[in-house]
Design a protein with these regions (language model features):
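N-terminal, active-site-proximal structural segment of metallo-dependent hydrolase catalytic domains
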Residues: 2-11, 17, 21-96, 106-119, ...
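A generic structural micro-feature
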Residues: 32, 125-127, 157-161, 282-284, ...
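Active-site beta-strand/loop signature of hydrolases that rely on acidic residues for catalysis
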Residues: 37-42, 64-87, 135, 167, ...
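Short catalytic/ligand-binding loop motif for oxyanion handling, primarily in non-cytosolic enzymes
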Residues: 45-48, 84-87, 109-113, 131, ...
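Surface-exposed cleft-lining segments at the edges of enzyme active sites
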Residues: 49-52, 147-156, 183-199, 230
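Extracytoplasmic/secreted proteins, especially bacterial periplasmic and envelope-associated proteins
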Residues: 59-70, 85, 89, 130, ...
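Structured beta-strand-rich core segments of catalytic domains in phosphoester-bond hydrolases
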Residues: 81-184
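Metal-dependent phosphoester-hydrolase catalytic domains
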Residues: 211-221, 228-341
Length: 341
């Protein structure tokens, strides 16, 4: 989300008409040397935000759980897990299908089940966690957290331990690393050039951090809410610059006109509601969420960048042109299946 950290940190001290889009089918478990990745900003603010802004986390969380379960990806990256009750519920609900998961990035600054924590992690009572977590059907052999050193001063992200999780997944003896992350958000009163510069610096942090841990040993996939505007940022070169900064290939549903944008307020009733809460346009449309892979000398990569789809799960009886009143988040999930060497 563009401004979730604004509200979360503050309380710590649905234009275009959709036509011809149908719900994406649930992914089947990948077979052979493949790994499917599902990434979603689930928009679950802190308990105080939830109460003061009437965000109904208790009602939305079971829908989040249901959507994750039905898409059945091998690995799930979640962002904006700021609500501790929702996080505990999701862990419990997914336990049978996803018995392995990392902790939430930035919840603690040492120990906590991580093999290592790096970056600028704060233990201050005025700083919230980073909200990012990885779930897996398959064993996680190692897990690392990095809290970004680069953050835009004067924005609410500055008061969050946002960063990235890195998990080594062992699927039937084939090891693949997965990065889950949530980059700097835009904020009213701060230049987008400034926040985009921070995002590029954060992607550079990810590249250096991952290279230092993984080297060329195995493929590295990445997913999450990068807050990189595929459409609105085209004139700035945001997408190309993001790929260059992270040293990788970022897949997006934005290249397929039949797909929803990952933040699609004209379609999503919840996106419209959150526009009113967070002061972004209630007709906002852009793709901010990506899945892809990272390059490094000698490192194996997927055979090709797969098609990335926006998972769309509207209410029963939905037809094109109606608002989606089922979505529990202002973002739609993205998903892809990677064929690995």
């Amino acid at each position: 989300m563009r401004k979730r950290a604004l509200l979360a940190a503050t309380v710590a001290v649905a234009s275009a008409v959709l036509t011809g889009v149908t719900a994406a089918p649930a992914a089947h478990a990948a077979t052979g040397n493949s790994l499917s990745v599902f990434a979603w900003n689930v928009d679950l603010g802190t308990s105080i935000v939830d109460s003061t802004e009437n965000e109904n986390a208790a009602g939305r969380t079971p829908v989040v759980e249901q959507i994750i379960q039905q898409h059945n990806a091998d690995v799930v990256v979640l962002d904006e897990l700021f609500n501790h009750s929702s996080t505990s519920s999701i862990e419990s609900a997914l336990a049978a299908q996803y018995p392995y998961h990392t902790p939430v990035v930035g919840q603690v600054c040492s120990g906590g089940g991580w093999n290592g924590i790096s970056g600028d992690c704060s233990n201050s009572w005025f700083v919230i966690n980073g909200g990012t977590m990885i779930f897996s059907k398959y064993p996680i052999k190692a897990q690392y957290a990095h809290v970004f050193s680069n953050s835009t001063s004067g924005t609410w992200d500055y008061n969050a331990n946002k960063g990235a999780a890195l998990a080594e997944i062992d699927k039937n003896g084939v090891n693949t690393w997965v990065v889950g992350t949530h980059l700097q958000a835009d904020q009213s009163g701060t230049s987008t050039d400034t926040t985009q510069s921070t995002r590029l610096a954060q992607l550079g942090e990810i590249q250096g951090w991952v290279n230092g841990i993984v080297g060329s040993s195995a493929p590295v996939l990445i997913g999450g809410d990068l807050n990189v505007e595929y459409f609105h940022g085209a004139s700035r070169g945001d997408y190309a610059n993001a790929q260059n900064a992270v040293g990788g290939v970022l897949g997006t549903p934005a290249t397929d006109p039949s797909q929803l944008t990952t933040m699609d307020c004209p379609v999503s009733a919840w996106c419209q509601y959150m526009g009113g809460v967070e002061s972004f346009p209630t007709n906002y449309q852009d793709s901010l969420d990506y899945v892809g892979y990272l390059n490094a000398p000698g490192r194996p990569t997927p055979l090709a960048l797969p098609s990335v789809v926006t998972d769309f799960d509207p209410q029963a009886g939905w037809t094109a042109g109606q608002l989606d009143t089922q979505s529990p988040s202002d973002h739609y999930p993205v998903q892809a299946t990677f064929q690995l060497p």
